[in-house]
Structure formats: C-alpha cells, structure tokens
C-alpha cells in the first residue's frame, strides 16, 4: 500500500482545528472556520477526481495544500473577512507548477520554538491517570518511515519523533528546543534529554540544526545560581523564562523588578548569553502559575527592561498574544494584556522598531490561521511597531504535528491592500517573509545564515529529507489536546489538579 497514514485521505494538509500546545484549554472553532474546513474537504474530493488522483495522493501534493488554502479564502470572504488572505492563483488547485511556485521556497527557516517531552512511560509514572493517559495522542501512528528500521515505532513527542516531524516532514532548517515551566524535578523534558535530542540530530551529520534553551524561573530557589552551570554543561543558546510562574500561586514577577528580574538579567549577562526568551500572553495552567495569570502575561515590563538593558535581546514568545480577545488595529491606551500591551510598553519607553525586543510567533501564527483578518492585524501591528527585522518564526511544534502547514500558510499569507492603506501595515514581500522565517532570528542567536545554509545543504538530514520526499507519507496529525476533557487529562498527567 502506497500510504500507511490516512490512506482514505480524510485529513487536510492544512491543520486548522482546536488543538493547543497544552498551555491553555482548547477553544471551539468559529462558524467561518468550520465552514472553511468543510469547503476544503469538499474541494479536495472534487479536485482529486479532476486530477485523476486518489484523494490521499492529491492531498499530499502541493495542489492539495493550495486547494485547501483557496477554499479557506472563499469561506472567510463569504463571512466578510477580507483583511487577510492566502495569495495563491486559482490555477494552483490543479496545476502542480503553479502550486509549487506558490507553496515551495528556498528560504532559511529557523524555528525558535520547538517542543518534545521525554519518553512517555516515565512522564506518565506519577499520574493516577496512567491507564488512560494521553489517550488522544495518536501514538500508534508514529511508525514513520520504516516500521522495522531505526525510525520505526517511536513514540510521539520523543526526540526521534521531533527530528522526523521537524526536519523531514517540513522545510525547517534549524530549530531551538525549549522548555515548559515546572520545577526542575518535574520537567517533562530535562536538560540532558534536550542535549540527547541535539546529539541525535548531530549523529545524522546534522550539526548546527538544533539549539537548546536553558530554562530559568528566577523565583524558584536555585534557578539563577544554576545558570552558569547550565551554560557550561549544555552550551545553551538562550534563556527561557516565564513571568507568570509562581511557587505558591500568589504572584508572579516582572522583568523590571529588583527581586527577580534584575538578577536574572545580570546573570544572563555574566554568562555571555545575552538572549532572554520570555513567555508572554497565552495563559498557563495552574497550580504552578500565579492566580493573576493573564496580568503577569502582559508586557508592561518589557519596554522598561529593554530600555535599561540595551545589551540584552528580549524575545517575547507568542508576542504577548492573548486568545480571549480578538485583535484589531492598535490604538494607544491602557493595554495590560495582549499584543497591544507589548506595543504600548515599547512606545511608552521610547523603544523604536528594530531595537532589542523581538516578537516570536509560536502558537500565535497557528491560532491566527483560523482567521486571516485577525492575522492581518496582528502581523501588521508587529511589523509596524516592533519592526520588520524583529518578528521571528516559531511554531510550538510538535504539539501541532509537522510545522509544514504553518510554513505553507505563511508563505502565501498577505495583508489586503485596503488594510495596508488604512492602518499603515506593510506588504509581506518575499524578502520580508524570508527575514521572518529565519534571517531575523539569526542575529540574537549569532548565526551566519550564509554559512549555515552552505553546511546544511549537504548534510545527512538534507539527503534523508530528499530521499523521503520521493514518496512522502505525512500524517497530517496534531498531537496536543483538542477538547477540554483531553486538556484536563493532560494537566492531571503532569501532576496538576
């Protein structure tokens, strides 16, 4: 059988569903998004017949992705949402050359927010829900390339699965493996396991493809003092932290406070790793988070910290995006949460665009794919106020499966001319898109993109990717929780109540 995964073609190549990254409860799709998925499914069947292909063969082609995105355009336009769209010619639904032109590219893609966890047996051990566990995770589908070979029968989320989903099933060239906010003892991915994943990639001659963060939560005793040891032992490329984190549930902390923020920044400076990545926006699950979760996820401290520490690069993970409020154009005001709180903080502290603050897109872009008009506002605001050289690519995968659909959607996304004229948003040109995909993040991570691309072009991972794509068999699956019940099971699994 040609396809081991989804042989009937029931799954769309652009995965717009309720899946989350486990940090917040799934939210239902809007009517227009449900209509978009339904129309895309109908068009896939019709276009497959016109092309003389099976439904699955059609959907795994670039025409299948183009057909899906074109259906999304049609459904959203019918709902009056025309501020953003996927810029694809109609012919791409049936003409492979047109689809390839629209959906493929040679950009350097550097995903600075990747996740996996250690083998599930150990992770599940403390939980009373071991018997049911993450029953929604399609572990039986993780026999990717060769069921009898090195890549066969791996568990979802492990290092091998991460390497396959990230580097074989997507166009990602480099990635950063990051962490979730827990105490060190409860981390679902420890520093040594992250380093082991990097070694797995390097064993495939994939040196330089995977970097790792050092997790530091300054209000946990000992975390700041461990930073030098972490850097020396694991060669961390940046620090990852969470201002919502709380050891007692009472309060978080701020980047500009003297008790926690200032010591963290100084210790980062002392290690020589002057890059601090801060989760902002998306609410996080209790009990490890403060009760004022959304408040401490706001960005009012970012501008102050950036102004006081011009030698430090602050990368705002998720760009401060808050899922509870629909984004529109920015207007100055008392913004305490959301993307607008980031912009307001920069403006109040005279931080001009393209300074030492970066806006990262992990989960944010994936969530915005539901609503291209909201996407136009969020992307437009970030590019206008944070800067065209300071918006950086991240996907939060592999919670969302392979990030290839996020890449294809962003490759074709455009802000409508009417929005550009009315709000001063820039056109997303191929050159700007390439900067967001990888060039912008190369500065804080101290990469020479030319040297990296030259090396990556001929390593074993590149050769394996080329061979695999002669007969690709993507799963089109997502792995994070998709319903509230799954989300609650997931929290219990991690020891949350």
Model regions: which residues?
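Mid-to-C-terminal alpha-helical segments outside catalytic/metal-binding sites
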Residues: 53-70, 95-102, 108, 123-124, ...
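Catalytic pocket-lining loop regions of alpha/beta-barrel enzymes
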Residues: 251-393, 401, 418-429, 475-496
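Conserved, mostly hydrophobic/aromatic
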Residues: 113, 239, 359, 396, ...
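Divalent metal-dependent hydrolysis catalytic cores, especially in the metallo-beta-lactamase
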Residues: 115, 132-155, 164-186, 209-215, ...
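N-terminal twin-arginine translocation
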Residues: 41, 45-60, 68-96
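Active-site gating/metal-coordination segments in enzymes
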Residues: 90, 174, 179-297
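Hydrophobic faces of well-ordered beta-strands that scaffold small-molecule active sites
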Residues: 110-114, 175-177, 212-214, 239-241, ...
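N-terminal secretory signal peptides
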Residues: 1-53
């Amino acid at each position: 059988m040609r396809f081991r995964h989804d042989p009937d073609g029931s799954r769309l190549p652009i995965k717009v569903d309720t899946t989350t990254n486990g940090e917040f409860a799934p939210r239902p799709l809007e009517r227009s998004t449900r209509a978009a998925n339904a129309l895309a499914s109908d068009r896939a069947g019709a276009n497959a017949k016109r092309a003389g292909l099976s439904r699955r063969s059609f959907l795994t082609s670039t025409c299948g992705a183009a057909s899906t995105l074109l259906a999304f355009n049609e459904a959203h336009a019918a709902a009056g949402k025309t501020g953003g769209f996927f810029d694809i010619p109609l012919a791409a639904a049936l003409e492979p050359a047109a689809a390839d032109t629209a959906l493929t590219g040679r950009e350097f893609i550097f995903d600075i927010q990747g996740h996996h966890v250690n083998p599930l047996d150990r992770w599940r051990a403390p939980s009373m829900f071991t018997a049911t566990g993450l029953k929604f995770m399609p572990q039986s589908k993780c026999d990717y390339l060769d069921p009898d070979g090195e890549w066969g029968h791996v568990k979802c989320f492990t290092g091998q699965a991460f390497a396959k989903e990230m580097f074989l099933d997507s166009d990602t060239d480099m990635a950063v493996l990051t962490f979730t906010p827990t105490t060190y003892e409860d981390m679902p991915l420890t520093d040594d396991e992250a380093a082991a994943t990097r070694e797995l990639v390097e064993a495939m001659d994939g040196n330089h493809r995977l970097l790792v963060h050092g997790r530091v939560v300054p209000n946990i005793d000992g975390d700041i003092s461990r930073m030098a040891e972490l850097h020396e032992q694991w060669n961390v490329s940046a620090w990852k932290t969470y201002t919502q984190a709380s050891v007692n549930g009472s309060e978080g902390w701020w980047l500009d406070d003297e008790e926690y923020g200032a010591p963290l920044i100084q210790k980062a400076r002392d290690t020589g790793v002057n890059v601090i990545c801060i989760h902002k926006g998306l609410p996080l699950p209790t009990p490890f988070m403060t009760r004022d979760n959304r408040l401490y996820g706001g960005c009012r401290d970012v501008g102050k910290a950036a102004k006081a520490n011009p030698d430090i690069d602050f990368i705002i993970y998720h760009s401060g995006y808050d899922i509870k409020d629909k984004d529109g154009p920015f207007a100055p005001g008392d913004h305490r949460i959301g993307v607008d709180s980031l912009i307001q903080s920069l403006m109040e502290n005279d931080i001009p665009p393209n300074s030492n603050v970066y806006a990262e897109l992990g989960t944010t872009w994936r969530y915005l794919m539901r609503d291209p008009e909201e996407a136009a506002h969020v992307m437009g605001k970030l590019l206008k106020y944070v800067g065209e050289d300071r918006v950086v690519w991240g996907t939060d995968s592999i919670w969302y499966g392979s990030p290839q659909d996020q890449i294809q959607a962003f490759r074709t996304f455009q802000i409508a001319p009417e929005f550009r004229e009315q709000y001063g948003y820039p056109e997303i040109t191929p050159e700007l898109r390439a900067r967001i995909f990888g060039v912008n993040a190369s500065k804080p991570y101290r990469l020479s993109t030319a040297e990296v691309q030259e090396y990556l072009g001929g390593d074993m991972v590149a050769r394996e990717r080329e061979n695999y794509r002669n007969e690709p068999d993507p799963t089109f699956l997502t792995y994070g929780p998709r319903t509230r019940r799954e989300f609650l099971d997931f929290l219990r699994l991690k020891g949350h109540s």
